[in-house]
Amino acid sequence: MEKRDELYAGKAKSVYRTDDPQRLILHFRDDTSAFDGKKKESLARKGMVNNKFNAFIMEKLQAAGIPTHFEKLIADDECVVKNLEMIPVECVVRNVAAGGLVRRLGVEEGQTLTPPTFELFLKDDAHGDPMINESLAETFGWATPEQLATMKALTFKVNDVLKQLFLDGGMLLVDYKLEFGLFDGEVMLGDEFSPDGCRLWDANTREKMDKDRFRQGLGGVIEAYEEVGRRIGISF
């Protein structure tokens, strides 16, 4: 497969076209950012760690019957994915109160959420990725009711698989965001799953093992990512 021109550069990944119009290459960079890009840093090994972490998780989800865009690793920091028509709506599940939920509602951080909450956000950096609902998504054409129903069902299926995976490694899957797209009309999981896009706490100590270490200046960001991976069986 031939890597061609850069299609898009995000905050931490670059997307490249290939000689196959239905396939793309994702390049995971060492860049990290927070607070809508106001805090930025380059962290050695991050691209490699997130690429391998994402591949491991995507393969677990595929084995559980969840369709994803992931196809294969081709380098320490690159993988091949299907070229999805992305749906501009993020799905967020929260198992434990943290982050934006605590700020919005004033609830206590660390409270177990039963049942888990499900939220939708519009992918729109210029407006701070605002929270939306199904009605808005349908009215403005961001997603159809059928697509939203499939996205919600898949998001909760991901929760069933990954909550147990991380719990077996002594960790709590606090919350996470997912993005979906269409491939030949089928809704499938896109983007990535890594500690950049979820919250993970040690189940006993509640130590933060995710991107909050960067947001809050706790240090040891990549070491924490690698420890999460080690606990669930990833070899870096």
From Swiss-Prot:
It comes from the Bacteria. Pathway: Purine metabolism; IMP biosynthesis via de novo pathway; 5-amino-1-(5-phospho-D-ribosyl)imidazole-4-carboxamide from 5-amino-1-(5-phospho-D-ribosyl)imidazole-4-carboxylate: step 1/2. InterPro entries: SAICAR_synt/ADE2_N, SAICAR_synt_PurC, SAICAR_synth, SAICAR_synthetase, SAICAR_synthetase_CS. Its EC number is 6.3.2.6. It catalyses: 5-amino-1-(5-phospho-D-ribosyl)imidazole-4-carboxylate + L-aspartate + ATP = (2S)-2-[5-amino-1-(5-phospho-beta-D-ribosyl)imidazole-4-carboxamido]succinate + ADP + phosphate + 2 H(+). PROSITE patterns: SAICAR_SYNTHETASE_2. GO terms for molecular function: ATP binding; phosphoribosylaminoimidazolesuccinocarboxamide synthase activity. Belongs to the SAICAR synthetase family. This is Phosphoribosylaminoimidazole-succinocarboxamide synthase. The gene is purC.
